[in-house]
């Protein structure tokens, strides 16, 4: 059975009534051999981690101290979180009472102690849902099952968002741009509600174009997830820049002042411009390639520490 599977893979597209046959290639054999010999892959299985990528975040956290077990209310947002390895690390290295939300366009069962929604991080409504999830108005002692269309909790969040959208508090939190300049007793509360996240981690990457197989909501939406690198360094670089910018916009909108940020980037000619945008948002910006990253990989990680106050998206992106 294994030999037959390795020799040939048949993909049946029921909507088009066609069979696509793809033979195994030397590159697939090399990838499989590399996986079997890789020490991080083996150790991930031993530690019951969902992928070897967990060790990259561990090494980043060892150096930059993103998570804290001493903070009882740390709020962590994991972008492109499926299959959930980074969320596992965040759960292990933060306090039991910390709140962790994974966002991915694929439905994926989150690790124990982690919540998730299926959503497109490029959509403003997703930012509203994230903000609402971390707000004191959304009670987290509810049980929700994995939904075929939207993962966990999103249907509850959608209902809650509809209920609170016309309230004065919603308008104050979601539309206020002058919370720093208005000295009143509620300014700290409003700041915390508008910028509810302490740490944003992003390991997003983007897929190949899909030309067939659109047949239901899950596969249609899941396709737009940041899924597979192409192996073409120029293409991977430009796609990763777009996703890093999307993560950076999320940080501008949701990350609290002095908060921390991590994103993966494939190196290339636009890297310095992205670094400049990072420096407009964070006081300290670092570039780091963990030992768990393969030597031949073009990936690197940018870490932003101590987010600045009064960051304007237009200024950040128009000046770089």
Curated annotation (Swiss-Prot):
It is an enzyme of class 2 (transferase). GO terms for molecular function: rRNA (uridine-2'-O-)-methyltransferase activity. Pfam families: FtsJ. The active site is at residue 264. SUPFAM superfamilies: S-adenosyl-L-methionine-dependent methyltransferases (SSF53335). S-adenosyl-L-methionine binds at residues 83-86, 104, 178-179, 203. It catalyses: uridine(2791) in 21S rRNA + S-adenosyl-L-methionine = 2'-O-methyluridine(2791) in 21S rRNA + S-adenosyl-L-homocysteine + H(+). It comes from the Eukaryota. One of its GO terms (cellular component) is mitochondrion. Residues 1-18 form a transit peptide. InterPro entries: RNA_methyltr_RlmE, RNA_MeTrfase_FtsJ_dom, rRNA-MeTfrase_E, SAM-dependent_MTases_sf. Its main location: mitochondrion. It is found in: Mitochondrion. Its EC number is 2.1.1.168. Keywords: Methyltransferase, Mitochondrion, rRNA processing, S-adenosyl-L-methionine, Transferase, Transit peptide. Disruption phenotype: Loses mitochondrial DNA with high frequency. GO terms for biological process: RNA methylation; rRNA methylation. Belongs to the class I-like SAM-binding methyltransferase superfamily. RNA methyltransferase RlmE family. S-adenosyl-L-methionine-dependent 2'-O-ribose methyltransferase that catalyzes the formation of 2'-O-methyluridine at position 2791 (Um2791) in the 21S mitochondrial large subunit ribosomal RNA (mtLSU rRNA), a universally conserved modification in the peptidyl transferase domain of the mtLSU rRNA. PANTHER family: RIBOSOMAL RNA METHYLTRANSFERASE, RRNA METHYLTRANSFERASE 2, MITOCHONDRIAL. This is rRNA methyltransferase 2, mitochondrial. The gene is MRM2.
């Amino acid at each position: 059975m294994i030999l037959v599977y390795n020799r040939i893979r048949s993909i049946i597209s029921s909507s088009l009534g066609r069979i696509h046959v793809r033979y195994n290639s030397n590159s697939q054999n090399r990838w499989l051999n590399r996986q079997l010999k890789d020490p991080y892959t083996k150790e991930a299985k031993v530690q019951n981690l969902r992928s070897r990528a967990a060790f990259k975040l561990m090494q980043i956290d060892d150096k930059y101290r993103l998570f804290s077990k001493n903070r009882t209310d740390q709020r962590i947002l994991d972008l492109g979180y499926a299959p959930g390895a980074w969320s596992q690390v965040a759960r292990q290295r933060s306090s039991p009472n910390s709140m962790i939300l994974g966002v991915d366009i694929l439905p994926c069962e989150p690790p124990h102690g982690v919540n998730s929604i299926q959503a497109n991080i490029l959509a403003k409504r997703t930012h509203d849902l994230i903000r609402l999830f971390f707000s004191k108005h959304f009670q987290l002692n509810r049980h929700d099952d994995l939904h075929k269309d939207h993962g966990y909790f999103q249907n509850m969040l959608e209902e809650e968002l509809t209920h609170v959208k016309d309230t004065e508090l919603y308008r104050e939190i979601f539309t206020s741009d002058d919370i720093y300049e208005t000295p009143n007793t509620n300014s700290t509360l409003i700041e915390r509600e508008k910028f509810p996240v302490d740490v944003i981690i992003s390991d997003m990457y983007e897929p190949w174009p899909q030309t067939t197989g659109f047949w239901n909501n899950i596969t249609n939406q899941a396709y737009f997830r940041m899924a597979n690198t192409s192996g073409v360094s120029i293409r991977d670089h430009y796609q990763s820049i777009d996703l890093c910018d999307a993560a950076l916009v999320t940080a501008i909108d949701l990350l609290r002042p002095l908060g921390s940020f991590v994103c993966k980037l494939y190196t290339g000619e636009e890297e310095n411009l992205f670094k400049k945008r990072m420096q407009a948002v964070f006081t300290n910006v670092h570039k780091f390639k963990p030992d768990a990253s393969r030597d031949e990989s073009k990936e690197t990680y940018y870490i932003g520490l101590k987010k600045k106050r009064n960051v304007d998206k237009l200024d950040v992106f128009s000046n770089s």
